[in-house]
């Protein structure tokens, strides 16, 4: 009677699928990667954000209020999320932020900003100006 030597950790997963906490892999990102069989067999890269508009939207944010800025660019309620990312299966999710003080700000709608959710002037670049509204950069 002989035992087959396991080539750890992949054989361990198939022999004992209910054990997701492997001692050799104690970091959370590794545990999630191993336990998610769906992601392993059906990988899905997130879609690229699309240009919603080529100019920012200026509005007043109220202190203490939480906002959800649309990252995917598909929302009909720009610059805020309306859940379109979920129904179109983009793999993206909104950026949740809380206003620290009441003030007027420019929120990005080209989705190319380096300081989300705030506009940094990237919409003036040639790449954004050449892109069509509704197309990815």
UniProtKB/Swiss-Prot annotation:
| Places the protein is found | Mitochondrion
**Main location (coarse class):** mitochondrion
Which Gene Ontology biological process is one annotated for this entry? Answer: protein maturation
Keyword list, A-Z: 2Fe-2S, Acetylation, Iron, Iron-sulfur, Metal-binding, Mitochondrion, Transit peptide
- Subunit record text: Monomer.
Q: Which PANTHER family match?
A: CDGSH IRON SULFUR DOMAIN PROTEIN HOMOLOG (PTHR46491), CDGSH IRON-SULFUR DOMAIN-CONTAINING PROTEIN 3, MITOCHONDRIAL (PTHR46491:SF3)
Protein task? Can transfer its iron-sulfur clusters to the apoferrodoxins FDX1 and FDX2. Contributes to mitochondrial iron homeostasis and in maintaining normal levels of free iron and reactive oxygen species, and thereby contributes to normal mitochondrial function.
What family, per the record?
Answer: Belongs to the CISD protein family.
Protein name per UniProt: CDGSH iron-sulfur domain-containing protein 3, mitochondrial
